[in-house]
Amino acid sequence: MPENKVGQFLLKNSPGNGIIEVLSVLIPERFNCELVDLIDWNHPEFISCYLDKQRLIDSAFAYSLTVRSSNAFSERTNTLFNQISTPSFTYQDDRFDILIRLSLQVENPWNATKLDAVLRRLDSATRDALWSTHIAVSDYGEDADLSASPIRTLVEWASEVDVCDLSGDSQKLLGTVLLWLTTTTNLKSRERTERALARLFALAPAQITYFIDSFSDIDDQYLVESLYSSIYAAILRQSNLLLLKQIAKSIPWARLIENVPDILIRDSLTGIFEYGKSLSVPALPEEMFPIHKHPSLKPLIFPNKQNIDEIREQCSEIARSAGSEFGDFGKYTMSMINLWSSTSLQDASGPQTEREKSEIFFAKQSPEVTELFDEIKALDLRKSLIDEQAASRYLENNSTNDYSFYFKNLKNSNEKKEIETIDFRLEQLQNEIREKISPAESNRTDLLLQSRNSDSISKFDKSAAQRWVVKHAYEMGWKKELFSGFEEMYCNEFRPPYQHNIERIGKKYERIALAQLLAYISEQYYFVPQNYDDVDDSVYKGIWQFNYRKIDLTFPPLITSNSTKKLPQLTEYQYNSLPPMSLHDQQEWVQSNTTIPNFSKIIEINDQASNNSWLLLADFQSVSDKPEDRDSELLQSDFWYRINSCIIKTSDLKDLIVPGENASLMAPDLIYIPNNMHQAYFSEYPYRNLYPELITQPQTFENKSMSKVTYESLLREYSWEYSDQATETQAYQPSRKLIQDLNLTYGEYGEWKSDYQVVFCDPHLWEQGRSRALCSKKALANYLKENNLSLIWLIGGEKRLFNPRKYLLSRSKLNYSEFSAFYYLDEFGAIKGTQNSNIDETN
C-alpha cells in the first residue's frame, strides 16, 4: 500500500479528508472489503504517519456507514462498527447515531430492525446505561455551531411528513425507532417523540396491531406506557369498527393488567375500552373493567426500615429522592398517596378513622396488650369528661357566645391534679405496650398510639409507600457503576438550563415504581373523599382525579389528512394595538367613550371562503403600550376586554335588557362555562364524560339585578395541566347540548360540522393567535328561532394608565375607566344592544 498512489495519498492526509471518506464508501461497495483492512498498519511508514487506524475507524469508516449502498454491509463491517470509540465521559455513542440515521432505509440490513435487535438483547438496566443515557443527551436542534442531532432530525421529520405516502415497511421502521426513543429520561424529548408516535398511529392505524404484537412485552414501562397512550390518542380519530375490533383483539388485556401493574397503562387501556364500548366494538373484555373494581394483583407487602437500610448504600440517590420527605420525589411527586386511606377494601365497608384503626390493631395483639390499651381508652374517656364538665360549668355562668373558653384552662385544682395523674399513667401504659410489641411494629405502634383519639380518616402510610418505591426502583437494576456518573454530570443542581429536562435514570425507575404502586393501591385500598363542591370524588375513578395524566397527545388535534378546504377565512374588525399618544392624549383616551371599540362589529365576523357570517361567542383581548424610555413622562396604557355569551329563553329577554345594559360585566366568572378540569383529553370529548356532574344545567346570573333569569352556555372550555406543571393551552368546544341539537360531528382541525359544513370552530387550532369560539350565524340563528331562545353577549373590560416606575413603590395615581356592552341577536338575525363607559379615578 505505501508504494502505490493511494498509499502515498493516505500517508499525507488525515482520516477526515474527503477523498479518504469517499474511498471508505467506494471500496466496500466495489470490492466487498473495508479500506481499513487494505492498509498494512505494521508498515514503518504507516506506524509513523499521521493516519491512525482507530481514527480512521472513528471518522471515515463511521461516516461511510451512513452513505454507502445497502449491499456494502458485511460481518466485517459489523466487527469494525463495534470498534468505533465510545467516550464514556460524555455518554454519547456515535454508533447509536449511525443506526438512527440508517433506521428508515427499508432495503438496508442495518435499518431499525438492527437497532431493535440490539436493544432487545440487553437487559433493561444495561440498555438504559448505554441507550437511554445517549438519547437523553443527544437530542438537540440546529444552531450556529452544530447541525441538528439525528434524533431531533428524525422526530421533527416524523412530526411533519405525510405518513400516508410512506410504505407499510417504512411506517413500521419509523414506529420502531420512535418507540425506543420513548425510553429516554429527557422529558421534552420524550414528549416530542410521543406526539410523533401518536401522529404516526393516527395516520397509519392499520399498523397499530403490529406494534401491539411486537412491543407489548418490552421490559421498559416507559416504552409500554408511550405505546398505549399513543394508541389511545390515535384511535380517538377512528370510527372504522373493523379496524377497532382488530386492535381490541390484538391487545393482551389480561397480561398488561395482571403482569404489568402500571396505573398509566391502565388509564390508556381504560380509555381504549371506553371508546370502543361507546361505538359498540365487539371483542372487548367487559369482565375486566373498571380495572380497579376487578382486583387481580397480590396484596401489597411493604419493606420495613431495615430492608431499606440494607440497600441504602447501593441506591443512596434513590433513597434520598424517594425515601423521605426531604427528597423532591418522596415529598411532592408522591403526595397523591395521601388520597388513599390505610383501610383495605377487604377489611371494612368503608375507610376507617384513626380511632377505629387503633382499636382494631390493639384488639389483635396479645391479651396483655389488649388489656393495657383498654385501660388507655378508659383514661382517655375520663380526661374528655373532665374537659366537658369544666366547659359546662363555665358556660352556665357566662355568655354562650363567648368562645374564648376554648383557650382557657377551666379546670379546678382537683381536676388539674387528676389530669396530671392520668397523664402519668397514660405514659406508663404506652411504654408497657411498646415493650410488648415486636420491634418490627414499633413505628406503627407509635403512630397508632398518637392518633388513637382522632376521628379523621386514617391515611395511607406514606413512609411505607416511599420504602416500597425505593426498593422496587432499586430492583429494576439501578447501580452506581452504571448510572452515578451520568446522573452527576447531567442531573446535578448546577447544570445549565438546556439540561433541565434531563432526569436521573434513578428517577425514571422511581416514576415506574410509583405507577406500579398506584396500580396496587387503586384496587386494594379505599379512596379518601376530598369533598369538592363541583365534582364527585367520593370514590376512585381514574388518575385524572389527582392530575396524574402527563401530556395530552390529542391536542393540538391529530390531523389525519392533508385537507384544509372549507376552513373559515376570517375578515374581522381588529383592535389589537393602541395609537401613539402624548400624555394629554392618554388622559383623554382613558376617559373617552369614543376610544372603546364598536363591539357590534367585533362579535360578527365575515368568512371570505364561504360568504358566511360567524358569531364570536367568547374571546379575551389584551393590549399594553409601555414607554420605551424609562425617563419618559408618558404612562403605561393598558386595555383589555372579555366577551361572554349565553342563551336564554326569548321570553326572558325583556327582563334582562335594562339590567344588562347597566351592570358591571367585567367579572371573569360572569358566565359559567363547563371545562375539562384540566385533565380530560381534548379528543375524549364528547364521547367520554369524566365529570358527568359538570354537564351544563341552567345557571343563575351572579349579578343581583340579573338573577331572575336563567341561562346556559353554548361552550366548553379546554385547558391542560398536571401535577408537575401547568400550560397555557386553551381551546373552546361546543357544549354537549349544542352538539346534540345541531347534530355536530368532529372535524379534521378541531372544527365541528353539520351536513359537511363547519358550524363551530376555534381558529386557534389551525392558525396562530388566541383562543376564540366562533359559531355559524345562519345555523345558530335557525336553532335559536326554532327553540324560542335568544343569544346574548355580556362584554366587559377596562382602560388603565399607570406609572410603571412608581407603581410598585408608592401605588401612584391610577387613571382608570371600566366599560361594558350588552348585545343580543334579535329574531331577524340583527345584533342589537348598547355599550357604555364608567369613569373612575382612584389612588
What name fits each language-model region?
Residues 123, 127-159, 224-228:
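HEAT-repeat alpha-solenoid elements in large eukaryotic scaffold proteins
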Residues 85, 104, 120-127, 139-140, ...:
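HEAT/HEAT-like alpha-solenoid repeats
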Residues 2-24, 209-301:
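Extended charged low-complexity segments that act as oligomerization/scaffolding linkers
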Residues 9, 13, 25-30, 67-72, ...:
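Residue-level signature of the C-terminal ends
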Residues 4, 34, 74-83, 96-101, ...:
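Amphipathic alpha-helical scaffolding segments comprising HEAT/armadillo-like alpha-solenoid repeats
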Residues 38, 44-46, 51, 76-84, ...:
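Extended repeat-based interaction scaffolds and adjacent low-complexity, acidic/S/T/P-biased segments
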Residues 1, 161-233:
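Extended amphipathic alpha-helical scaffold segments
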Residues 93-97, 113, 191, 224-228, ...:
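Alpha-solenoid HEAT/ARM repeat scaffold
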